[in-house]
């Protein structure tokens, strides 16, 4: 069975995490404006419920704890009971950790992996049985350009998003014969709360890393609220992509993200070609 496109579907049922602000909030708005129905989850669902009270018949705002498998299962069950199915799962909830790799503590690392990777995977695993049963569905994982390119100060956050990239690519191959699609979204800097309340800075500061990770910390302070990316346009782009006839596996958003991804590909190609003979000489001789 091949993958099915949402382009010819009627009104969609969305299940979106992290909807109190940023990409999640704007996706709720854009989906409701399309006439779709939305299950909006966050730690403070009251905000979403109040903002979109006029669409209460097409909105279910519920709290969701991505650390709690039982809570996740109950949330998914509520969604299906209310709307009959789920068409699109958007794993948007996430958290940042800023600091050099050596500066980050075990507990800081575990906390960001818990939400960005384990929580995302828990929810995906809870929704997939419904997708398999209906032979359709689309998983949208919010990664980052930091899931393709590692930068000073973002090492641990990069690691979580690199994990999301690998998970998404593998799931796409596994689920395609079942009618399920996957898209991993890689935004650059957007004017959300990511550099504010959604970001934790490693407590330890090592002076030797001031010219690298330290400069990134200062960048986060200086650029917060002045990022060039518009989350409203990002939400529209995500919807356009996943409702197209051939949705992409990878969706890069923003000029800076596009430039960094292109530079990464060029750098990889250069390494591949430089070390081609060495690479090809390591197999057993047949």
Language-model-detected regions and their locations in the chain:
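Residue(s) in the substrate-gating loop at a strand-loop-helix junction
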Residues: 144
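Active-site helix of classical SDR
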Residues: 124, 160
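Substrate-binding pocket helix/loop in short-chain dehydrogenase/reductase
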Residues: 100-101, 108-110
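Active-site-adjacent segment of SDR/Rossmann-fold oxidoreductases
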Residues: 149, 170-181
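Conserved glycine-rich cofactor-binding loop
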Residues: 20-22
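The beta1-alpha1 cofactor-binding region of Rossmann-like NAD(H)/NADP(H)-dependent oxidoreductases
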Residues: 64-74, 106-107
């Amino acid at each position: 069975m091949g993958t099915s496109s949402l382009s010819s579907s009627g009104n969609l049922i969305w299940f979106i995490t992290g909807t109190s602000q940023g990409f999640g909030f704007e996706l709720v708005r854009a989906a409701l404006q399309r006439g779709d129905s939305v299950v909006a989850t966050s730690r403070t669902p009251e905000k979403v419920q109040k903002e979109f009270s006029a669409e209460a018949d097409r909105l279910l705002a519920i709290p969701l704890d991505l650390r709690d498998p039982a809570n996740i299962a109950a949330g998914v069950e509520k969604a299906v009971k209310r709307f009959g199915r789920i068409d699109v799962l958007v794993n948007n909830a996430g958290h940042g950790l800023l600091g050099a790799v050596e500066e980050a503590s075990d507990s800081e690392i575990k906390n960001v992996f818990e939400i960005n990777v384990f929580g995302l995977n828990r929810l995906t695993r809870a929704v997939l049985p419904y997708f398999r049963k209906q032979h359709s569905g689309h998983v949208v994982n919010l990664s980052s350009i930091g899931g393709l390119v590692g930068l000073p100060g973002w090492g641990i956050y990069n690691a979580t998003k690199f994990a999301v990239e690998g998970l998404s690519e593998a799931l796409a191959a596994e689920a395609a014969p079942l009618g399920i699609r996957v898209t991993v979204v890689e935004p650059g800097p957007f004017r959300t709360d990511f550099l504010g309340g959604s970001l934790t800075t490693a407590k330890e500061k090592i002076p030797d890393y001031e010219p690298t990770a330290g400069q990134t910390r200062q960048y986060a302070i200086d650029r917060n609220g002045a990022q060039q990316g518009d989350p409203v346009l990002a939400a529209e782009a995500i919807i356009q992509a996943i409702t197209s006839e051939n949705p992409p596996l990878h969706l890069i958003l923003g000029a800076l993200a596009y430039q960094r991804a292109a530079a990464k590909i060029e750098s990889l190609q250069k390494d591949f070609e430089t070390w081609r003979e060495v690479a090809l000489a390591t197999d057993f001789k047949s």
